[in-house]
Amino acid sequence: MKITPVKALTDNYIWMIQHGNHAVCVDPSEPSPVLEFLVRNRLMLAQTWVTHPHPDHEGGAAALWRGYMESPVYGESDIEAATHTVTAGTRFTFGNGQVTVWATPGHTDRHTSYLLETSDGIHVFCGDTLFSAGCGRVFTGTVEQLYDSFQRFNQLPEGTLFYPAHEYTAANLRFAAHIEPDNADIQTALKAAERTPTLPVTLAHERRVNPFLRTEIPAVRQRAEALVGKTLNSGLEVFAALRELKNAYR
């Protein structure tokens, strides 16, 4: 199985998953990059997976379905183009892989991640929940939901690969360095991120550089407390403070 990022809009990645001469697209913001990829690689579209109902994630799904009407569109009931409604725990297959749907709200009140388990490990298509060195903004969800989604991700094996839908890594790492200026892993990752695409990323890597997965680290909590000017008594409070600090960070 081969997984390829296709660039779309300004900073979106549409993830294309190939098995034989069939492919899945994840979060098609627009149809044309997907169609060009399919033609160039002589592939048939087998499935489309949508994580949440924002135009830069579902905008191309309806057009792709019209072009490939045998191809199901998976998404929650608020995804207009969905032909196959999913909920937490829904399972289906693609190629030799097993797909499990997780509810990972926070960015939006209803947000799904697709966990693809293959012989070479777990691949998580996480939309706008987790970014490398960061997390999604809270729109219609809550920071409590987002924190819980991160806690669940953090229980996966450290070799799990995450496939976010945006390349925000360099900007996120600059904020991470603001929180942990003495973290050598962040400095190394930042230098690399300025030169090349960074995705996908392993959970092991994110545990070293993502402040939103490091809320129990004393240096992270102390820095957050210093910046917000109050005591933070739990991982959730640290997470929420970091999210507010990131919103204001320039």
From Swiss-Prot:
Catalysis: reaction(s): an S-(2-hydroxyacyl)glutathione + H2O = a 2-hydroxy carboxylate + glutathione + H(+)
EC number(s) per entry: 3.1.2.6
Pfam families documented for this protein: HAGH_C, Lactamase_B
Gene Ontology MF, one: metal ion binding
Binding site for Zn(2+) 2: 56-57, 128, 166
Top-level EC class as recorded in UniProt: hydrolase
InterPro entries: Clx_II_MBL, Glyoxalase_II_hydrolase, HAGH_C, Hydroxyacylglutathione_Hdrlase, Metallo-B-lactamas, RibonucZ/Hydroxyglut_hydro
Cofactor(s) demanded: Zn(2+)
KW Ion transport (keyword) present: no
CDD domains from the UniProt entry: hydroxyacylglutathione_hydrolase_MBL-fold
Family from the record: Belongs to the metallo-beta-lactamase superfamily. Glyoxalase II family.
Function: Thiolesterase that catalyzes the hydrolysis of S-D-lactoyl-glutathione to form glutathione and D-lactic acid.
Quaternary structure and partners: Monomer.
The protein, known as: Hydroxyacylglutathione hydrolase
Record gene name: gloB
